[in-house]
């Protein structure tokens, strides 16, 4: 099904008129459909570790080469053009004899920063790297993939069975995956916008969720919107999850429901 057909399915659930093209029509139904499409799609994708929207990738931190190290009143001053750090950032330093470890930075300008609480000592000639790391609690941070909706698992070994419900500890904050792995193998739900790949049960769930938003936007705050959302949460989403789990090792705490029950809710 196309995006327009899915939105039309949602509109049909609330008695709305069908659209010819969801991206170009100018009717109130089309405007509302476009307004809530992204919200509903991201919510539905986040609700389950869908097989059709799963990607796996390897993330590895990249260290930045240091240009020079000098003495600034007893503190270690590091020079690197466009270093990208701000005061308060934490950096892990390697191969600088007087500053091996992690330090908080004081930004001097775009090309230099000092290491707080460091003690300069002679002996540096060249080389060394730095890496921006979380301020506390974790050893590394990896930028989220640009198409990531939700991170599902982070492991340290590509041969580890990522279909099982196990993962190394991690946390997602401000566009980064925080963990203790320099190289992380990540399974995540990606923002799959190819509606032709959506299973029928997911389409039914998505259109029902979208209808709950459209009902309130087009008809005002009424019980219809809440009723449709309940149908999504209690019936359509569990049904889609059940179908997804049967394709392989998925989440096992799922329920299934019949299409007849779905039809009766909208009779």
Predicted regions and their residues:
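Small/polar beta-strand repeat architecture
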Residues: 63-135
